[in-house]
Amino acid sequence: MKQVNRIMTKLMVGCFVGISATLLVLIISGTLGSIGTEFGSLKSPILTYCASGICEYEPIINFMMSWIIMSILSMLFISNVIFVLSVLLKKRTSCFFSSLLFLFACTWGCTKIAPIFSIVHLIPTTYLNCLQVLSGEIGYLTQNNNINALTGIIVLLVCNIVLTIINFSLMKMREVK
């Protein structure tokens, strides 16, 4: 039970740090953006894409709940990936660069490598850029209609559960040695 608490604490701290960093960036950019003008409105339009190629503008408030849920799951996914790599790789520097390279390459590859476009909706790093997913931009770029908020939440949730199980297994194996 002690090990479970320790792993969950590490994951929650990683998620908290990620969410805090995101909030800090949003607060700073919102503050800087409001200098000389008003703060803005939740009715501000965002360009959305659909499979037919017809674009529409929708208010940002329509995306807020999905964006918050996907952002939290994305931060937890990033924390889980880093935690798994930190258990596998002993050195902090190699863990940092491996995590950075893995997450960047997978996120970039989801929209650039054409042969995987048909399965890109099953890759969790597709959903790390929540706003592009919610606006339909990634689905439009990859011509994959399965990329949406619901699929993203399910994929990120399943991957987080699997990575948490892997974390527990790796910690148990490490404890046995």
Where are these regions (language model features)?
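Cytoplasmic juxtamembrane regions at transmembrane-helix boundaries
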Residues: 1, 79-103, 173-177
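Interfacial "coupling" helices/loops that link adjacent transmembrane helices in transporter permeases
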Residues: 1-9
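Secretory targeting signals
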Residues: 8-87, 130-150
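Residue-level recognition of pore/gate-forming positions within transmembrane alpha-helices
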Residues: 14, 100-104, 160
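Transmembrane helix segments
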Residues: 21-22, 89-124
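Transmembrane helix-loop junctions in multipass membrane proteins, especially transporters and channels
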Residues: 26, 30-42, 91, 111, ...
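Alpha-helical transmembrane segments of multipass membrane proteins
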Residues: 27, 80-84, 104, 108, ...
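Alpha-helical transmembrane segments of multi-pass membrane transporters/translocases
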Residues: 74-75, 136-177
